């Protein structure tokens, strides 16, 4: 009787629905894959495209000749706002100085 009362109280609640599986994740970019101890890509070993581990000297020399993928650029850490002023109703001016000495003045209209 407890199950029937729950269905009467909450008609959209279905207690017998099997749990849904989450959608498949997209594959990681190549630079995000873990590397094994020899320095080869883990994805290459799984797909069968990696070098054999019988000759470690040729594996290390050939893997160093391959161009390595570069990760995406990151936001500079040392940029900071030196001064900000309210120049009018809904307007703010920011002065940003980069580590290289470049100074940028931004005017933001809110």
Curated annotation (Swiss-Prot):
Keyword line: Early protein, Host cytoplasm, Host G2/M cell cycle arrest by virus, Host nucleus, Host-virus interaction, Modulation of host cell cycle by virus, Phosphoprotein
Q: Where is the composition biased (Polar residues)?
A: 84-94
- What's an example GO BP annotation here? symbiont-mediated arrest of host cell cycle during G2/M transition
Q: Where in the cell is it found?
A: Host cytoplasm; Host nucleus
Note the Pfam families from the entry: Pap_E4
Which cellular component appears as one GO term in the record? host cell nucleus
Q: Where are the transmembrane segments?
A: none
Q: Which InterPro entries match?
A: Papilloma_E4 (IPR003861)
Changes after translation: Phosphorylated by host ERK. The phosphorylation triggers a structural change that enhances keratin binding and protein stability.
- Chain spans, region Disordered: 1-94
Regions of biased composition (Low complexity) lie at 52-67
What other comment is given for this protein? The major E4 form is first synthesized as an E1^E4 fusion protein from spliced E1^E4 transcripts, such that the first few amino acids of the E4 protein are derived from the N terminus of E1.
| Record's subunit section | Assembles into oligomeric complexes. Interacts with host CDK1. Interacts with host SRPK1; this interaction may favor expression of late viral transcripts. Interacts with host cytokeratin components KRT8 and KRT18.
Q: What function does the entry list?
A: Contributes to multiple aspects of the viral life cycle including viral genome amplification, suppression of suprabasal cell differentiation and egress of newly formed virions. Induces host cell cycle arrest at the G2 phase by associating with and preventing the nuclear entry of host CDK1/cyclin B1 complexes. Inhibits cellular DNA replication by preventing loading of host replication licensing proteins MCM2 and MCM7 onto chromatin. Within the cytoplasm, associates with host kinase SRPK1, a splicing factor regulator, and inhibits its activity.
What family is it from?
Belongs to the papillomaviridae E4 protein family.
**What is the recorded name of this protein?**
Protein E4
Organism, per UniProt?
Answer: Human papillomavirus 29
What high-level taxonomic lineage is stated for the organism?
Viruses, Monodnaviria, Shotokuvirae, Cossaviricota, Papovaviricetes
């Amino acid at each position: 009787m407890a199950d029937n009362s729950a269905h009467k109280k909450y008609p959209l609640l279905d207690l017998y629905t099997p749990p849904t599986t989450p959608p498949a994740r997209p594959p990681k970019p190549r630079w995000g894959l873990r590397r094994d101890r020899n320095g080869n890509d883990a994805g290459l070993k799984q797909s069968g495209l990696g070098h054999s581990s019988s000759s470690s000297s040729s594996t290390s020399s050939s893997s160093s000749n391959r161009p390595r993928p570069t990760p995406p650029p990151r936001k500079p850490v040392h940029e900071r706002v030196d001064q900000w002023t309210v120049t009018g109703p809904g307007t703010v001016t920011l002065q940003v100085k980069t580590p290289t000495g470049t100074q940028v003045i931004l005017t933001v209209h809110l």
